[in-house]
Amino acid sequence: MKNTKKIALAGVLTALCFVFLYVGSLFQTMDLSAAAIGSIVILIAFIELGKKWAFYIYVSSAILSILLLPYKSPAAVFALFAGFYPILKESLNRIKPIFLSYVARIAVFNVALVLLVLVFKKLLAIEADYAKLEMAIFGLANITFLVYDFALERIAATYFTRLKPLIFGKR
C-alpha cells in the first residue's frame, strides 16, 4: 500500500476510533463498550497497516480522547489498556507453550487494571476500603478479559475471511 493511502486510512481510522470513544463518553453506560470497539479499530489498523501505524493511530486516538471527551472514562480505559492490547496481543500469542501465553496476557491485563483503579481512585478521591468488593471486581474483570481476548481473535479471523475481501477486494 502506498504511503499516501496509509496516511489517509490512518486518519480515517483515528477519526472512527475517536467517534466510538466520543459516543461512549456521551452515553456513560457505554464507556467500556466504546473502548472495546475502539480496540477493534486498532486491530483493523494493525492488520491493514502494521504495528507502527497501529501504534500511531492508538496514540493519536488516546490523546484526542483525553483532551476532548467530556467524560474521561472511555479515554482512560482506551489509553491504559484497550488501545494498545490489540497491538501487543500478536506478540503475546507467539509465547509458547500456550499456558504461558495466557499467563502473560492476564498479567498485562491485571497491570492495566491496577493502573485504571489507581487513576480512578485519584480522580474520584475514593478513600473507603472496599477490599472484598475490589477482589470480586478483579475476578469478574479477569473473566471478562478472557471473553474479550477470545472475541478479538474471532473478530480478527472474521475480518480476514469475510470483511477484508468485501472492503478492500482480494489482494
Which role fits each region the language model picked out?
Residues 1-47, 52-53:
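Hydrophobic transmembrane alpha-helices
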Residues 3, 134-171:
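Alpha-helical transmembrane segments and their cytosolic interface
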Residues 7-12, 33, 55-59, 75-76, ...:
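Hydrophobic alpha-helical transmembrane segments
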Residues 22-31, 62-91:
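Interfacial aromatic-anchored transmembrane helix boundaries in multi-pass membrane proteins
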Residues 45-56, 93-99:
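Membrane-helix interface "capping/anchor" motifs
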Residues 71, 106-122, 142-150:
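Mid-bilayer segments of alpha-helical transmembrane spans in multi-pass integral membrane proteins
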Residues 78-114, 118:
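Short helix-perturbing small/polar motifs within transmembrane alpha-helices
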Residues 120-133:
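Membrane-interface helix termini and inter-helical loops of multi-pass transporters
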